[in-house]
A protein has these predicted regions:
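Small-residue-biased structural context
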Residues: 1-132
Length: 133
């Protein structure tokens, strides 16, 4: 098995996770209470699996190999595309965590909106990102 096969399998796991994120957002929109603990688990999975484990492999190994073997085209694609999208996903996760912290202190609708917006932004951005890979 090639390392890229493992990374493709990780993409499948992440796609399943993203479907669950969107489903949870829909449940809240449909009137169910906002499950703070479940959204905290989203933050944890996003950081530990999607970012640390998966994006870490890309950033530490795959991207270097791509630049070595494909040259300037890969360098531009990685530095002006893939890494930018990784950082955007990280930003969505930070925003989600910040909104959760505010909501727990003061459960206002505006913070609930911020939670759903950050979670959906993360899910949409990462889904598009993986589809390009």
């Amino acid at each position: 098995m090639y390392s890229t096969d493992i990374m493709r399998a990780e993409h499948d796991h992440i796609f399943t996770f993203l479907k669950a994120v969107r489903a949870l957002c829909c449940q809240v929109l449909e009137g169910l209470p906002l499950p703070v603990d479940d959204f905290r688990k989203i933050v944890s999975f996003a950081r530990n699996y999607s970012d640390h484990q998966h994006h870490g492999k890309e950033e530490n190994f795959l991207f270097n190999e791509m630049v070595t073997n494909l040259g300037p085209i890969a360098d531009k694609l990685i530095n002006h595309g893939m890494l930018v999208e990784h950082d955007l996903c990280r930003r969505h996760v930070m925003d989600l965590e910040a909104a959760l912290n505010l909501y727990e202190k003061d459960p206002q609708t505006i913070y609930k909106l911020d939670i759903l917006t950050a979670a959906e932004g993360y899910a949409t951005t990462l889904h598009r990102h993986i589809s390009k890979e």
